């Protein structure tokens, strides 16, 4: 597959799965042995774990809209720079919801093999938006 093909797989996953919350076709995008990478650790969560992740995020932000700002490819890897808007409706990592819209940016790094996402990691810039909403209090 080409870099362009790999970008399309990630873009379609964002449009068809993450932005809608409809996980019925997630198997078309995510491999059986799908791995999430966080804090330098690898977690093989498979399709079931990916479904739980998507539904969990959409519970917190039910109107989530992820917009791709740019994508870069290198071999099997796709880097996606994105922005997100969504209403903060449920508690998240111990933070109380505000019921207000929030906007933040982030970067995802996905590895594609045999036409499916096999590995995912990334980082989201949530500190400033959460401070602006009073969810995270900055020390004076």
Model-derived features with residue positions:
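C-terminal and inter-domain tail/linker signature
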Residues: 1-140
């Amino acid at each position: 597959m080409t870099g362009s093909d790999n970008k399309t797989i990630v873009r379609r996953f964002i449009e068809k799965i993450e932005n809608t919350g409809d996980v019925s076709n997630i198997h078309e995008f995510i491999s059986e042995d799908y791995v999430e990478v966080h804090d330098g650790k690898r977690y093989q969560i498979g399709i079931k774990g990916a479904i739980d992740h998507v539904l969990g995020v959409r519970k917190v932000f039910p109107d989530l809209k992820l917009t791709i700002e740019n994508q870069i490819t290198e071999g099997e890897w796709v880097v996606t720079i994105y922005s997100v808007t969504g209403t903060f409706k449920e508690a998240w990592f111990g933070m109380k919801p505000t019921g207000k819209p929030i906007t933040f940016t982030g970067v995802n790094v996905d590895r594609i093999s045999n036409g499916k996402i096999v590995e995912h990691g990334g980082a989201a810039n949530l500190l400033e938006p959460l401070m602006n909403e009073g969810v995270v209090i900055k020390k004076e």
